[in-house]
């Protein structure tokens, strides 16, 4: 059995809970306060008693108004209570006593009609009630007596008899309240449809708990003059509304201001009122205004997403259309909503498997790796420190290290295909194809001044050696010769010790090596080095014994020396071909060319001319008028004008091709050396030359290579060992010879830079501040002036303007044509920077035979010079019985009474020692001098 609390009954009565409880206690009910509960029977009795008392007199009107103002009645909407406006007391007094007389047939008929009615079908019943309420509100100020007489006469005309006290059929109009309906036994909880949630507030609305609902409009009502009799409430009918899904509760709204007693205007009850239920408070507006306001105040959370998106946005200035800011800017004045119904918020679960992959190319920076894994860079750095790697956020790590770090965070590393890898794939795709025969590439190697270039001159019938400074080759040269025996490409390499790298590159790009050995000189150092390079490259060697026309030529000695180096001649049972030549006398040149063709036939040299070009840089330089220029040896494919290529860290487009004679070429096939213009920079000699599909790919690859080179420099090991620490501490004592180096071509520059760096010793170091190809510029002068360096130019000369600037800045600029002259001057400059050394030389001995004491001077020893001579201001040692007592300087030297500059052997003299007076007879004075000796470069 359900129980009802007192404050719920107080709400039905429109009084405060405390006042209502006090009144019940005075009447003898056993309750303690407004929170006490009573059963349904007691609640019905309290309703009858209290309502009858309240209607009978006017003494409770003021208390009722106060209670209504303090506790406004609420209406249950969708499972929650919403405050309703309070009707002024005067209106309540006139309306609450209305009684309705309805025949039983009409009541039964209404019940039958109302049973199947749903929430949406209740509008016709509401429209029938509207005139009655409107009439009541309109005529509230009319006198009561005339109204009663008029209504009685109308009722009598319609029905002959009206009972004053109805106790059976219709005892009193049905009083329906939210609280009583909820607590009725067996009565289901009535919930309105969602579209009735918003309650219209009006200061002149009629209290829904005090107005009776007539069954039809043809029955007139009359105000009651007497209080109700205690008769029980009879339920005429109940409308079963569909139970709606319970929505999240919204905060209760409170009225913005208290109600004011003023004349109410005609109002229309809410169209959502159900039959037999309490009426909704009427809004003080016309039906048209009411409809528009209902549409405007429709619950937003009841709208569908499509309706909510189509709802008009906040109004701005007239004619202004927001096109760039979106709804966040336009709706900034609105109150934020509690949540978006249609927003699909993903739970904080793990990422999808497809998102747990990180693409890494060859390297990746720590910051990029952390960003792709969505973790802090400091955490990744901590992981790297745990692996023993000290890395910064901008430092790169390789793919293996990135894989270890990513695995700890649950990621998989996928290796991306870089442009560099794309070039490799492109090169592999070009492999195969139809190959045709090509001419051999022959490199001429040997010791300096053994006649390499002279042999080439004899073959080409040119005179290159005379044009070389000092008669030696200082550039790597490539020539294509068309001979009677066949076409041959020759690569001429320097023979000087400084050009080891050039000889190594020449051996790598060649098919056959011609080793030139002078018959009068034999095997030398660079000869042995050339043999090592050739054997390392697995290239066959043809020996040309040159200068056989000289008187002291010894061919057999050369063969013996070479046989010791695994180059046995064929006539001795070996596999090496020998040719005896004389370049100046044109002896043996044809036999040498035939040997070259024979070796080429044995190698079966072939290449595919239709594939993408692959070549090698033999030489590169920065030309003043043409920019970067490189000598390329095409190894495969056919190079044409307009081809895009990558060479080392640079890229470009073939804009012009020249042969070794300076003639323009349209294309160049395999084994053809050409000079290419159109590079973005000067490449290093030995770099690979690759033709790519387009300019975009070429630039991307060159940029990636440049970045990798820079990262390699920055990523050098920064760990300092104890030995390195001592080396750095001692570097302050090591002197430096700073050099700014300029050369005409890249290969010579590299060779000269390496040779200069090899001159460094423990005492003095050669430091190259800057090196580059091309002429000496103003920036070189300023750099040398700021760093106290010298400038060395190899095959380049400064202009008059640069010379004037060098004189102004006091910078030493030197130019050379022969490389070993430059190296000798650098060595002399290093020696000049060293501190000189001194050697001691004993010049004479003197024996003390007497002692004289001279005032203000001290003790003077009378000595006899036994050997050599004694010089003034020379050093002296005082020896007593072979033990050195003192080492100092001779203070005075006299012969008799005159000062002497020196005293020779066999003469007597007086010698005074500075700051030493303990001279005794028998001591030996040993005179010596310190001679300066020039310093030498150690190891």
From Swiss-Prot:
UniProt keyword Oxidoreductase, yes or no: no
Region: G1, residue numbers: 446-453
InterPro entries on file: EF-G-like_DII (IPR053905), EFTu-like_2 (IPR004161), IF2_II (IPR044145), IF2_N (IPR006847), P-loop_NTPase (IPR027417), Small_GTP-bd (IPR005225), T_Tr_GTP-bd_dom (IPR000795), TF_IF2_bacterial-like (IPR000178)
Keywords noted in UniProt: Cytoplasm, GTP-binding, Initiation factor, Nucleotide-binding, Protein biosynthesis
Annotated GTP binding sites: 446-453, 492-496, 546-549
Transmembrane segment boundaries: none
Protein name, as recorded: Translation initiation factor IF-2
Organism of origin: Desulfotalea psychrophila (strain LSv54 / DSM 12343)
């Amino acid at each position: 059995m359900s129980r009802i609390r007192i404050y719920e009954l107080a709400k039905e009565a429109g009084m405060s809970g405390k006042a209502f409880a006090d009144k019940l206690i005075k009447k003898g009910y056993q309750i303690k306060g407004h929170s006490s509960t009573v059963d349904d029977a007691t609640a019905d009795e309290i309703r009858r008693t209290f309502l009858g008392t309240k209607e009978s007199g006017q003494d409770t009107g003021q208390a009722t108004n106060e209670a209504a103002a303090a506790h406004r009645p609420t209406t249950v909407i969708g499972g929650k209570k919403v405050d309703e406006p309070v009707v002024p007391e005067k209106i309540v007094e006139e309306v609450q006593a209305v009684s309705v007389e309805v025949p039983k047939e009409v009541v039964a008929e209404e019940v039958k009609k109302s049973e199947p009615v749903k929430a949406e079908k209740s509008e016709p019943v509401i429209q029938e009630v509207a005139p009655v309420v409107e009439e009541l509100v309109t005529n509230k100020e009319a006198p009561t007596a005339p109204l009663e007489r008029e209504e009685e006469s109308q009722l009598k005309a319609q029905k002959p008899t009206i009972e004053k006290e109805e106790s059976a059929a219709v005892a009193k109009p049905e009083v329906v309240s939210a609280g009583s309906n909820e607590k009725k036994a067996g009565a289901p909880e009535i919930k309105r449809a969602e579209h009735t949630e918003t309650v219209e507030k009006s200061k002149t609305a009629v209290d829904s708990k005090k107005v009776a609902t007539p069954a039809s409009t043809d029955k007139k009502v009359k105000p009651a003059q007497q209080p109700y009799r205690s008769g029980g409430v009879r339920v005429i009918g109940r409308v079963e509304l569909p139970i709606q899904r319970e929505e999240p509760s919204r905060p209760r709204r409170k009225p913005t201001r208290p109600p004011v007693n003023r004349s109410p205007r005609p109002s229309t009850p809410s169209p959502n009122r159900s039959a037999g239920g309490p009426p909704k408070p009427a809004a003080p507006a016309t039906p048209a205004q009411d409809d528009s306001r209902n549409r405007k105040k429709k619950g937003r959370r009841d709208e569908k997403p499509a309706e909510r998106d189509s709802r008009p946005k906040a109004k701005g200035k007239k004619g202004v259309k927001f096109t760039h800011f979106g709804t966040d800017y336009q709706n900034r004045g609105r109150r934020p909503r509690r949540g978006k119904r249609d927003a699909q918020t993903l739970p904080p679960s793990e990422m999808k498997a497809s998102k747990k992959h990180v693409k890494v190319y060859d390297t990746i920076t720590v910051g990029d790796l952390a960003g792709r894994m969505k973790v802090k860079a400091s955490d990744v750095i901590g992981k790297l420190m745990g692996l023993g790697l000290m890395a910064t956020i901008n430092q790169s790590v390789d793919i293996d290290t990135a894989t270890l770090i990513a695995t700890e965070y649950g990621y998989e590393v996928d290796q991306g295909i870089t442009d560099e890898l794309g070039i490799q794939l492109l090169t592999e795709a070009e492999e195969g194809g139809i190959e045709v025969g090509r001419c051999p590439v022959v490199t001429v190697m040997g010791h300096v001044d053994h006649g390499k270039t002279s042999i080439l001159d004899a073959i080409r019938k040119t005179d290159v050696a005379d044009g070389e400074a000092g008669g030696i080759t200082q550039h790597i040269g490539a020539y294509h010769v068309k001979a009677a025996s066949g076409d041959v490409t020759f690569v001429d390499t320097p023979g000087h010790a400084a050009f080891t790298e050039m000889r190594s590159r020449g051996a790598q790009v060649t098919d056959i090596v011609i080793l030139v050995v002078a018959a009068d000189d034999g095997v030398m150092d660079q000869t042995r080095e050339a043999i090592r390079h050739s054997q390392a490259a697995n290239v066959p060697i043809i020996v040309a014994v040159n200068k056989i026309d000289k008187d002291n030529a010894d061919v057999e000695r050369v063969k013996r020396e070479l046989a010791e180096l695994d180059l046995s001649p064929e006539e001795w049972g070996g596999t090496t071909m020998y040719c005896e030549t004389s370049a100046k006398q044109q002896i043996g040149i044809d036999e040498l060319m035939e040997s070259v063709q024979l070796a080429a036939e044995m190698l079966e040299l072939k290449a595919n001319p239709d594939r993408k070009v692959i070549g090698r840089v033999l030489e590169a330089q920065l030309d003043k008028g043409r920019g970067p220029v490189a000598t390329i040896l095409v190894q495969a494919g056919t190079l044409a004008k307009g081809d895009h290529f990558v060479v080392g860290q640079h890229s470009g487009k073939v804009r012009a091709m020249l042969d070794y004679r300076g003639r323009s070429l349209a294309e160049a096939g395999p084994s053809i050396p050409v000079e290419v213009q159109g590079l973005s920079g000067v490449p290093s000699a030995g770099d690979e030359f690759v033709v790519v599909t387009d300019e975009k790919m070429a630039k991307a690859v060159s940029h990636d290579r440049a970045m990798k080179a820079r990262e390699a420099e920055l990523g050098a090991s920064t760990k300092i060992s104890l030995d390195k620490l001592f080396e750095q501490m001692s570097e302050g004592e090591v002197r430096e010879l700073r050099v700014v180096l300029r050369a005409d071509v890249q290969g010579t520059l590299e060779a000269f830079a390496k040779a200069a760096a090899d001159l460094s010793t423990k005492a003095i170091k050669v430091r190259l501040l800057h090196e580059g190809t091309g002429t000496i510029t103003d920036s070189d002068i300023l750099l040398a002036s700021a760093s106290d360096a010298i400038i060395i130019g190899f095959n380049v000369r400064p202009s008059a303007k640069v010379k004037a600037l060098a004189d102004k800045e006091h910078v030493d600029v030197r130019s050379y044509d022969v490389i070993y002259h430059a190296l000798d001057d650098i060595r002399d400059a290093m020696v000049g920077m060293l501190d000189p050394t001194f050697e001691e030389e004993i010049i004479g001995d003197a024996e003390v035979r007497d002692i004289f004491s001279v005032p203000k001077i001290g003790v003077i020893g009378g000595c006899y010079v036994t050997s050599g001579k004694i010089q003034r201001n020379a050093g002296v040692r005082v020896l007593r019985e072979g033990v050195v007592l003192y080492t100092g300087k001779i203070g005075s030297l006299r012969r008799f009474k005159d000062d002497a500059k020196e005293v020779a052997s066999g003469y007597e003299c007086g010698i005074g020692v500075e700051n030493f007076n303990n001279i005794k007879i028998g001591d030996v004075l040993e005179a010596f001098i310190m001679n300066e000796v020039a310093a030498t470069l150690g190891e």
